Amino acid sequence: VKDVTDFLQSYAVESKQVSVEIINPSKENIAKKLSEIGIRGYPIRTSSADSASITNVYSAIKIDYLGKSETIPFVLNISRLEFDLTRKIKSLIEEKENPVQVVCASSFANGYSLAFQYLEAEGFSVIQTSLPSEKNSSVDISFDELSDIPLIIFGSDKFTKTDCKILEKFILNGGKVFIASQPYSIDFEDNWSVKQNESNQLFERLMFTFGIYFKQTLTCDISNLRITMTSNSDVNGNKKSAHTEYINYPLWISLRAQENALSGLSLFWPCAFDIDNEVAEIERLKTTTLLFTSNRSWQIPRTENFITNPFAVPKSAESEEEYSTFAVCASTTKENEKDPSLILFADQYAFSDSLLSYNSNSIFDVDSRSLDFLCNGIFMLNGEDELLSLKTKTTFNTTLYKISNENIRNAAIKTLFTTCVLPIFINLTIGFVFFLKRRRFNK
């Protein structure tokens, strides 16, 4: 892949300590050797007007340093290559892994396998730990035993009063935590009803310490996802033959592109919150918004129960005054410190296997924007801002090599005109004008 080859050569020019060797597996006949070190070919379908074929493509990068190595197993473009290279080289030089511990405090604790896989693919070494109240044996590891390792918590359905006290102490004493949870849970496998147990309430009160106050509402937005529903009744409840309907569901929010989510991302039954920094300052903390809804967002208050039925949930606010922008993710930073100690993401379902699968085109095309934000959050907690800036860097121009055979003649003519004909014409024009002025001056 020419883009990748050119980028690697440019990357090596920046330092005398970096060298690049390009190897063509078909010419070197080393496909078997590559397979032994974890590099395999990927079948790529190519087609033209006359034929179609499948080619086994090798496009991997192996980085060697003092007898150790790291591998990027497959790369076809340079959209994030600088980030991947820098991360791998940094890991080799510093001789350390990037550990992160994960606690599943959700009611569906086994529903986050995709998040685990994504974290590992991004170079993190995942350690599954438990809440202190759930430690059953000496084999189990409680999250507070690994105070130097950043912590991810999914859900809040299992918190005890003791867990909340230990977590608060963990954060205030220097621990780094990314929490993804609403102050309630959704019965996603059945009727989508909203439940709030004592554990959710304890978690909600814990957030008061950081100046975060959950609204007793569900958050809706005009910018939302369209879902597919099957129904055997009409809008009045009368029976009719089974049919499929596509419904805009305001409780599944599509966050628009913003500073901390350049491609936007999806939220499922999120609970917005207010921030009170006068309360946070008691512990010498400051909380700031990271993600927010659109300005056409509104809240559904709890009556007897929250309305979550896609056919019954209001599609808009009752009045214009109810529309506003609401915080759905925030970070809390200690006084005189640059890096946050806590990131609260007000939705545990955006990282779950069920909703990631539902919101994706196929198992090979998962909507990973929320998982990407999760990884970014760990970089923020670790103070790796420079690495994060490389990850979100998007100003690559590779259009020179993105020309089809059918358009190559026209592209060549345009290139020749721009680089040869146009400069000659400009120089001749300048010379002619200068000649006329000189001639008039001599007269």
Language-model features: where?
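Juxtamembrane extramembrane loops of integral membrane proteins
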Residues: V1-C164, Q182
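Generic alpha-helical structural element
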Residues: F74, I78, F108, W192-Q196, ...
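Acidic, S/T/G-rich, low-cysteine, solvent-exposed domains in lumenal/extracellular/periplasmic regions
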Residues: E94, N110-E386
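Juxtamembrane amphipathic/hinge helix adjacent to a transmembrane helix
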Residues: M380-I408
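Alpha-helix boundary/capping detector
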Residues: L34, T46, N232-D234, L400-N407
